[in-house]
Amino acid sequence: MSLLLNGSVNGIPHSKPYNYSTLLSRFIESYNELQSYKSGKAVKVDGRTLSVAAVTAAARYHASVELDDCPTARARLAKSRKVITDKVESGTSVYGLSTGFGGSADTRTDQPLLLGHALLQHQHMGVLPSSSQALDVLPLLDPNSSTTMPESWVRGAMLIRMNSLIRGHSGVRWELIEKINEVLSANVTPVVPLRGSISASGDLSPLSYIAGTLVANPAIRVYHGPAAYGARQTSPSSDALTQYNIEPLPLASKEHLGILNGTAFSASVASLALNDAVHLSLLAQVCTAMGTEALAGTRGSYDPFIHATARPHPGQQIEAAHNIFTLLEESKLARLHETEVNIHDDQYSLRQDRYPLRTAPQFLGPQIEDILSALVAITQECNSTTDNPLVDGETGEVHHGGNFQAMAVTNAMEKTRLALHHIGKLLFAQSTELVNPTMNNGLPPSLAATDPSLNYHAKGIDIATAAYVAELGYLATPVSTHIQSAEMHNQAVNSLALISARATLNSLEVLSILMASYIYILCQALDLRALQSEFVSGLKNIINDELVSIFGSFLSASQEDTLSKKLLTIMKSSLEKTTTMDGVDQMLATAASTTTAFVDFFGSSEFTDASLLGSVVALISHFRSQVASRAANLLDQLRRDFLSGERGLAPASSYMGKTRLLYEFVRVTLGVRMHGSENYARFVNGLGVEDVSIGQNISLIHEAIRDGKMQPIVASLFT
């Protein structure tokens, strides 16, 4: 996408290209990269080019991993390793090689291997399920998920740790990196405690479980066996390595610390979070475009003049507005152009959309910029060395520093999580407007497709989304403000990056549920708009028919046309104001709204034969009765046709712009039908027979978001 930034020449405003990497371009690039890995391309570990997409591919989709074993890479590691062996042989004092750890670095030893064992021993302190046997008391939380990391987090951490070690700054052997990859490739995953890391000297304890697996510590358990939904088999690491013919690797000096001292777990969880955050922030723009259609809003709110010229923040005014504007091309539901009207013609109606639509680019844009900033930071973290000490193989110098301090990850996650809340808040505001008959431009209350007295369809969703956005607000609270001094006050400041990344994944889960709920009601609203459009077309014919039948002998053709248009306008206005009524009552009220127009018309100078006025007025009641009856029958027929699928699985498609691809994915691919068939049949078969529950349909959409099945649809909207 070409972005523009305003400027001026001789005082005349103009726009010029602005070099900015858009969220959309990053999403498309990442999506294509992920697809290549899923198609068989190996993730390359070279210390420089690891991407969020690559981490996602290896962590979630079991993509193969290939080490860059070029002579240069091997030589770099060999030089770094030689520095360590030389220091050991010469008796040089080096942190973690001859000293204790952290606040205990004042101790000394000439036993580096035993020192490594002591390091692993004291870090293997996490709380995990002690047995897989059934409990004799029901737990308050799931014993596994409440204490144990998901496998995808651990797999991502193993990949990132290899990518850091291969840079040659850690003093480890090539064989160590190969062994991690061998374990990863065999789909043997350490069981790692969920809690216990403050991400200060890296994620020490979680990484110690990877080290414990490599040395076949029988106290460390691993997942293994066929991949399946849910938990796999767990066994002691020693048994699993034997089963898969993997030789344990006795660690050499400094290698215990080389594995533990890094930010791999924080970076892994952050990478997985950002992969989904980019998708959801783009999906929010698609939802806003669909919301504009569903609410009969105006495309003009996203006009380039407002955003690319007047206030050209890159992510905000330019990208978000451009995407939404483009998605609304050729929509028959959104107003594509502002139409100037007389002040009396739009009296008592809003002249512009409310804030949730009209200011969506301004609200979404800063979130896009923050997520892009986080993406840059986490990508850099995945391609950095986060050890201490660091080894310069060229000079032989050992540097004592603090690259393990993961505040870069924390900041990235804090801003991402806050952005997710703001996205959720915007979509919540749109959704509450959509289900409210006083705000949704003529849609029925709770988006009921049948008589609203016995159909409260989206009311539960309206309540639930309030709970979701409230939880997002709670989760958006910074984690870093809760940093505590730790480890003998040596780690007096720390990052809590892993905790922050975990909280961000929680936010993503809540936001994806909220978005699934919104997409569900958007599809319902769009179907109702299509139904209304067909109803208005039918109503126009009914009015014309009844005018000719009842008043034809009193009116000329031009008078019939004039009166018909006026009556249709009045009845459309009445329909919008009476959506809380059941169908029959609404049609009676709508037909009754024509009375004044008839009286005004036949009492005007246009109707010249005053002697017939009494006869004409007597026929108005008959006209109202006929129109009300036929309109009620038409509405009932349309409801039956739409709900039964006679109008197709996706009846609103022809009315929509580019957003129809997402709508069709929900309606056709996922099989989520328009709601209301049980209500139309007056629950003759009870609940859950003719249709699944509302929650089951929303769950299908949520799973498509969560599992990445919706990403190809979003990508296709922009390519």
Curated annotation (Swiss-Prot):
Binding site for (E)-cinnamate: N261, Q352, R358, N388, K459, E487, N490
Active site feature: Y95
MF GO annotations: phenylalanine ammonia-lyase activity
Alphabetically ordered keywords of this record: Cytoplasm, Lyase, Phenylalanine catabolism, Phenylpropanoid metabolism
Pathway the protein contributes to: Phenylpropanoid metabolism; trans-cinnamate biosynthesis; trans-cinnamate from L-phenylalanine: step 1/1
Cross-link (5-imidazolinone (Ala-Gly)): A200-G202
Entry GO CC: cytoplasm
Entry's localization field: Cytoplasm
GO biological process, one term: L-phenylalanine catabolic process
Residues bearing PTM 2,3-didehydroalanine (Ser): S201
Entry PTM: Contains an active site 4-methylidene-imidazol-5-one (MIO), which is formed autocatalytically by cyclization and dehydration of residues Ala-Ser-Gly.
Catalytic activities: L-phenylalanine = (E)-cinnamate + NH4(+)
InterPro entries: Aromatic_Lyase (IPR001106), Fumarase/histidase_N (IPR024083), L-Aspartase-like (IPR008948), Phe/His_NH3-lyase_AS (IPR022313), Phe_NH3-lyase (IPR005922), Phe_NH3-lyase_shielding_dom_sf (IPR023144)
EC number assigned by the record: 4.3.1.24
Superkingdom field: Eukaryota
Family per record: Belongs to the PAL/histidase family.
Subunit-level organization: Homotetramer.
Described purpose of this protein according to its UniProt entry: Catalyzes the non-oxidative deamination of L-phenylalanine to form trans-cinnamic acid and a free ammonium ion. Facilitates the commitment step in phenylpropanoid pathways that produce secondary metabolites such as lignins, coumarins and flavonoids.
Protein name as it appears in the record: Phenylalanine ammonia-lyase
Lineage: Eukaryota, Fungi, Dikarya, Basidiomycota, Agaricomycotina
Gene for this chain: PAL
